[in-house]
């Protein structure tokens, strides 16, 4: 159970941690700022989340329960909370000590309204309704020093699980009733806890408009084992004393508390100061710990079961409170959840801020109009009361109401979204006559919250996603991929979207086989990949369905011979927007260099002689004089002369220009000639093949049939955007013991004199498609960094001879390298 919680904490909240908190050795591929790589890892079942530092784990640990709920509650070390009630006989011994601490907390809470109160300890600032009562310190391992973490954490739910509370729309409308709370029922079973519906509470201390409410009237209820004075302070701070338009979301009090006017007035002053402190913490842009605590509070309040008071209907004469944000309705086109990039400038933080999820949760909670629901895996709703439904009808819009049961909130963790359904029985599926807006927490790698409008007779599809990690270009590519793959007969839903209906099981051809074609095994071993229709995706357009229905044996010729895929295709068109990972490694003067160009050595013909690059640009250099050379990152540079003033005179192989540039703007690359100095003989054979280059994409692993398949799929999908504009990069593959050389043979004067070389020692994996051998790819490692790229080729004929040639070259190179690097004589000498 602890392993599951640990895995969820690493996979979900790694994206919520700020980049500055990650260790320097964390070189996750999220730094490349590309969603396509995350889709590749989602397809292959890999994860890009790495282990975060211990401070980050402690600050993000939330729940304290033995049984994992289908909500956002998890922890690193589970604790037992029966000790709270087992040690009740020790209350009399610590009563005097508790009263002194509460008096200190009362004095500090009055003076804690300024920003200077952030440094105060959280334990001393917890208010209590009465000075005569004693509240035992709860066991916790959070040790958060900020104020916002201790005010609203309720982790005393180990042995006292309350009845399933109603939805948060109802509890917001409740008034602070003076009635004592009912006695709690017996603890729920683990199966019932799986169906336990939780409520989401708004941000403590201020309303959704940022205004601080006036001091609330003092009120207290009966005893509740799971109550906490800190939560009571936060919950009571939501009630408005002057307008009475807002009701407290929950009525909680400490054990043995009575209604006292003096204690209530003192509590109101403490709540006011604590609210100001929390508002200062949550609005501070430079305090990352405050944001972490606030996010922890929001999710912890939503995940902590609490006692449920008697509902009291809201008077009808009170005007409804105007929300600060637009509600999410079925016909509301101006909703912020659909605005996408238009709403990004309105965010209070940076577009790449990892705390965007906290902002969205706060907005969603404050609006009170759209529930979070997991499509296809919804949990059973809690029973509804007629009084609660009547009180809910006063504030919920009419288009969002359900005639049978009103909206409810369900927070589902990422393990529930990605894994199999929980053993708890699922709720009955809503029919076509019960449409309603649902917010779907989708794609955990991007922190995207996408609205799904479940319309009758149509499977809900995500619209514009309000995510800071997705740009307009990537959203267009994602929508294009979804449209193309849904038109195919055996298509699979892309990783970035999920449907509300039940997903059809994958057929046998889409299951990844464990057989791998590594370069050191027998040359007859083949690579088992998925079907070409999903992998290539070149014929998935609706107007070309006839080419999709071709047989698997004729799929390669049909796809390459169709009108939509001429024999010339290239991914590097500057007019269209797509990911930089799909840019051709052979770039011309109209497009920028791709990040995969540094994986090999560039060479071109200079003054009638083929020269290889000697340096690689590591910074961008903009010339300010006529004799200076423009450089971009990863540009291949041939240094012809080194000046004394730390300036180089060289030739930019990408642009074909000469000039001078600072010496520190380029780094030397290891050439293949240096590696072959110890070789006893020169390469005796060279195989040449005429193929077409499709593109390169960066991958997270150096081998794997799933990695190669996903790379082919992404490259082929990106090719559909540019197949009508540019001819393909027709190239000659020269395979030898030195490596693989890609020489361009057509397309322009730049292409005729340029080539790319990958050293054999950096090639780690290769293979062709078993059902359509016209597709071939190999994975190379960066010469200096721990980065990998996959290069995909296509041909009119079978590419199996290319795979056998690469395997043969690698086998001979490996044997020769072992004989040179590890001679057997040294073993006997020692």
Swiss-Prot record:
Residues 242-504 are annotated as: Necessary for interaction with FGF13. InterPro entries: JIP1_scaffold (IPR047178), JIP2_SH3 (IPR035637), PH-like_dom_sf (IPR011993), PTB/PI_dom (IPR006020), SH3_domain (IPR001452). Residues 683-819 form the PID domain. The JNK-interacting protein (JIP) group of scaffold proteins selectively mediates JNK signaling by aggregating specific components of the MAPK cascade to form a functional JNK signaling module. JIP2 inhibits IL1 beta-induced apoptosis in insulin-secreting cells. GO terms for molecular function: kinesin binding; MAP-kinase scaffold activity; protein kinase activator activity; protein kinase binding; protein-containing complex binding. PANTHER family: C-JUN-AMINO-TERMINAL KINASE-INTERACTING PROTEIN 2 (PTHR47437:SF2), JNK-INTERACTING PROTEIN 1-LIKE PROTEIN (PTHR47437). The modification Phosphoserine is found at residues 257, 304, 307. Residues 77-105, 333-352, 471-490, 541-555 have a biased composition (Acidic residues). GO terms for cellular component: cytoplasm; neuronal cell body; postsynaptic density; protein-containing complex. One of its GO terms (biological process) is regulation of JNK cascade. This is C-Jun-amino-terminal kinase-interacting protein 2.
């Amino acid at each position: 159970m602890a392993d599951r919680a640990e895995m969820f904490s690493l996979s979900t909240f790694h994206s919520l941690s700020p980049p500055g908190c990650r260790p320097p050795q964390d070189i996750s591929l999220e730094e490349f700022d590309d969603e396509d790589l995350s889709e590749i890892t989602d397809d292959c079942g890999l994860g890009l989340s790495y282990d975060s530092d211990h401070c980050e784990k402690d600050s993000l640990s939330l729940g304290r329960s033995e049984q994992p709920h289908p909500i956002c509650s998890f922890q690193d070390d589970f604790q037992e909370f029966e000790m709270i009630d087992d040690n009740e006989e020790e209350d009399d011994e610590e009563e005097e000590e508790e009263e002194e601490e509460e008096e200190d907390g009362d004095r500090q809470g009055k003076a804690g309204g300024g920003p200077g109160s952030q440094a105060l300890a959280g334990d001393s600032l917890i208010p209590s309704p009465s000075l005569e009562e004693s509240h035992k310190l709860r066991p916790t391992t959070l040790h958060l020093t900020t104020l916002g973490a201790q005010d609203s954490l309720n982790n005393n739910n180990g042995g006292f699980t309350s009845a399933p509370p109603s939805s948060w729309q109802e509890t917001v409308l409740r008034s602070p009733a003076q009635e004592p709370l009912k006695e709690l029922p017996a603890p729920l079973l683990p199966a019932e806890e799986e169906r336990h519906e939780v409520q989401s509470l708004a941000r403590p201390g201020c309303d959704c408009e940022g205004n601080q409410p006036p001091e609330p009237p003092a009120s207290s209820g009966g005893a509740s084992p799971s109550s906490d004075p800190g939560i009571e302070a936060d919950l009571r701070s939501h009630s408005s004393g002057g307008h009475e338009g807002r009701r407290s979301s929950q009525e909680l009090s400490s054990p043995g508390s009575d209604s006292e006017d003096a204690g209530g007035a003192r509590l109101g002053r403490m709540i006011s100061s604590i609210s100001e402190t929390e508002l200062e913490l949550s609005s501070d842009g430079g305090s990352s710990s405050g944001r972490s605590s606030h996010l922890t509070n929001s999710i912890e309040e939503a995940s902590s079961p609490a006692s449920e008071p008697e509902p009291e209907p809201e008077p009808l004469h009170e005007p409804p409170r105007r929300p600060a944000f637009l509600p999410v309705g079925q016909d509301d086109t101006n909703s912020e959840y659909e605005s996408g990039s238009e709403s990004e400038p309105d965010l209070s933080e940076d577009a790449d801020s990892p705390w965007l999820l906290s902002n969205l949760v706060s907005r969603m909670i404050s609006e009170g109009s759209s529930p979070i629901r997991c499509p296809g895996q919804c949990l059973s709703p809690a029973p509804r009361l007629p009084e609660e439904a009547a009180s809910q009808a006063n504030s919920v819009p009419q288009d969002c109401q359900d005639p049978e049961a009103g909206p409810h909130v369900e927070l589902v963790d990422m393990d529930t979204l990605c894994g199999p359904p929980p053993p708890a029985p699922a709720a009955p599926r809503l029919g076509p006559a019960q449409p309603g807006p649902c917010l779907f927490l989708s794609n955990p790698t991007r922190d995207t919250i996408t609205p799904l409008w479940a319309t009758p007779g149509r499977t809900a599809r995500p619209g514009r996603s309000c995510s800071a990690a997705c740009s307009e270009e990537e959203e267009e590519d994602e929508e294009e991929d979804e449209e193309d793959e849904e038109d195919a007969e055996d298509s699979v839903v892309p990783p970035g979207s999920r449907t509300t209906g039940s997903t059809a099981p994958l057929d046998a051809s889409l299951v990844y086989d464990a057989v791998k074609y590594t370069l050191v095994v027998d040359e007859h071993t083949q690579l088992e990949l998925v079907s070409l229709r999903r992998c290539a995706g070149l014929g998935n357009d609706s107007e070309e369905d006839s080419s999709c229905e071709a047989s698997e044996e004729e799929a390669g010729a049909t796809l390459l011979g169709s009108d939509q895929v001429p024999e010339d295709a290239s991914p590097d068109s500057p007019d269209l927007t797509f990911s930089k990972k799909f840019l051709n490694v052979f770039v011309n003067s109209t497009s920028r260099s791709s990040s995969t160009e540094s994986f090999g050595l560039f060479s071109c013909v200079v003054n009638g002689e083929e020269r290889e690059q000697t340096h690689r640009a590591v910074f961008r250099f903009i010339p300010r004089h006529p004799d200076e050379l423009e450089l971009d990152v990863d540009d291949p540079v041939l240094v012809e002369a080194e000046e004394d003033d730390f300036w180089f005179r060289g030739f930019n192989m990408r642009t074909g220009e000469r000039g001078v540039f600072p010496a520190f703007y380029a780094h030397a690359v290891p050439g293949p000639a240096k590696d072959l100095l110890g070789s006893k003989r020169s390469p005796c054979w060279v195989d040449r093949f005429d193929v077409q280059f499709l593109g390169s994409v960066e991958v997270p692993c150096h081998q794997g049939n799933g990695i190669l398949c996903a790379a082919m799929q992404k490259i082929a999908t990106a090719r559909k955007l540019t197949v009508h504009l540019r001819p393909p990069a027709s190239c000659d593959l020269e395979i030898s013991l030195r490596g693989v050389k890609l020489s361009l043979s057509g397309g322009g004067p730049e292409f005729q004199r340029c080539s790319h070389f990958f050293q054999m020692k950096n090639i780690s994996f290769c293979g062709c498609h078993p059902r359509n051998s016209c597709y071939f790819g190999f994975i190379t490692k960066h010469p200096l960094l721990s980065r990998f790229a996959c290069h995909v080729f296509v041909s009119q004929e079978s590419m199996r001879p290319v795979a056998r040639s690469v395997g043969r070259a690698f086998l001979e190179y490996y044997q020769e390298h072992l004989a040179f690097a590890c001679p057997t004589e040294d073993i006997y000498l020692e």
